[in-house]
Each structure stands twice: as structure tokens, then as C-alpha cells.
From Swiss-Prot:
Originating organism: Methylorubrum extorquens (strain PA1)
Biological classification of the source: Bacteria, Pseudomonadati, Pseudomonadota, Alphaproteobacteria, Hyphomicrobiales
Name of this chain's protein: Coenzyme PQQ synthesis protein B
Gene from which the chain derives: pqqB
Source superkingdom: Bacteria
The protein's role, per its UniProt record: May be involved in the transport of PQQ or its precursor to the periplasm.
Pathway: Cofactor biosynthesis; pyrroloquinoline quinone biosynthesis
Keywords associated with the record: PQQ biosynthesis, Transport
Sequence similarity: Belongs to the PqqB family.
Entry keyword annotation includes Transport: yes
Entry's Gene Ontology BP terms: pyrroloquinoline quinone biosynthetic process
Matches recorded under PANTHER family: COENZYME PQQ SYNTHESIS PROTEIN B, HYDROLASE C777.06C-RELATED-RELATED
Amino acid sequence: MHVVILGSAAGGGVPQWNCRCSICSLAWAGDSRVRPRTQSSIAVSPDGERWLLLNASPDIRQQIQANPQMHPREGLRHSPIHAVLLTNGDVDHVAGLLTLREGQPFTLYATPGILASVSDNRVFDVMAAEVVKRQTIALNETFEPVPGLSVTLFSVPGKVPLWLEDASMEIGAETETTVGTMIEAGGKRLAYIPGCARVTEDLKARIAGADALLFDGTVLEDDDMIRAGVGTKTGWRMGHIQMNGETGSIASLADVEIGRRVFVHINNTNPVLIEDSSERASVEARGWTVAHDGLTLDL
């Protein structure tokens, strides 16, 4: 199984377009300690030829250009991307669908709830129905979006996308609006969970034994954005677990047998983005890799 992390940042990327927090300021200045990062997306293939795109970032055209595996290869119109799978309806996971509208056949997969958030917005009708097939997938149903690649979706604690929030919103609920994926090929297993509000025993059982885990790395501490002075929301309010602390992802997953552990979907205010920081060193010392754009895994 071949895995390419196309985009390793959370919504807005690094640096964010209007941000001068300490981390974004380093990125704007071209400081080598902070790599620029595009928004959350990965691609997975069983053979290096046919690819499944997981989440369609607003930066998808840039990501395709930066990764030769994703380039058109033949004829006037072609793409090695055979299917797209959404893990939620967040803007940074669906906006890139609008870029994939140029008459290229593929199948869009998601749970009924996630797909409804796309179907209910007519702007996505630019993906012509006769070209882009939309396929609903039930939780715990195993399917093959690309031949040789088996995928199972499961609910994880999360929340509805920001643009669908209302007074009834519940943070940490386990529904079909935020899902994790277990991807299998050639006897290897990859767990991809870019959004998760908390770690449950069921989640730990789901991912136990995986050869690699790509997990929500939005915030180091719950109050990262507040500390940076650029926002008032906590990680929990955004539906994202913190890395540190007794209930954080590092401690909560420490006793789970997993091969490689990689943080993805990293917010611009997370100090682990600074490569020589004590925060980065601490995370790495506990067995985690901080993803960057273009990172590849061969399982």
C-alpha cells in the first residue's frame, strides 16, 4: 500500500493567509524551521497507479502539481485519482471538489449524512452527475473504492461542520458526520482519522494492530489558539482532541499496538510545527511523527 500525505495542515494551511502568529510569521519569513503546509488530504493506492483521494482540500490543484504520482499521464484528459472519500463535511475537506469538476470521471464516497451536506448545496452540481457518481456508504460496511483497496468507515467522536452548526449541536457525539477509515491492501492496515474529539475504548479496539495511524494533530494543548492570541475557541470546541495531557491523544493511545504513528491535520498555532522546538522533540520522543506535505509511507 502506497500513501502520500498531500496536505498536512488543518483549515487554512500554514501560513494562514492573514495570520501573523509566531508560527505563521516564521513561515512568511521563509524560516526553514517551519515548512509551509497545505490543507488536509491524503492519497492511497494499492499499486501506485490507481489512487483513492481522502478529502478534497481547497489546495488540491497545488497538491496534485507537487506530487508526480497524481499527474495526468495519457490523452487529453486523465487522472490517476479514481475515487474520492470524505471523512466529514468540513470546508477544508470538501471545497476541493469544485476543482475536480473538469469532466473527469470518478466516484465520490461518503456516509449518507456527509454526502447529504454536499448534495444539499447546489454549488457542487458543477460535478456533473453523469460524470461523477455519488455513492453512499454505511458505517462498518467494507467496500472497494479502488480495486485491491478495502475500506471500512466507522464513527468517531466529533461534531458537524462549522457551517452546519446550530443550537442543537453536540460536541463529541459519535454519528456518521465524522468518521475514521480503516484501509487495507496487501495484508497491511492503515487507519486515517483526521478529526477526533476524544479517544474511546471502541476507537482503540478499532485501530489496534494497524501498521500505521494518521491521526488528528490539530492542537498540542486544548487552548493553543487562545495562547497564540488569534482566537477564542478551544480544540474541544472545534471537535479536536489535544495531543498532550492525561486525556490527550498521545497518552490515550500509548497502550495501543500500532506500527507508525503520524499526526496530520495540524493547526497553524500548534508549536510542534517548529522543527527545533521542545514541543516537537517531546512529541517525537513519545513515538509520533509530525507530518509534512509530501510525506510518503509504503506499507
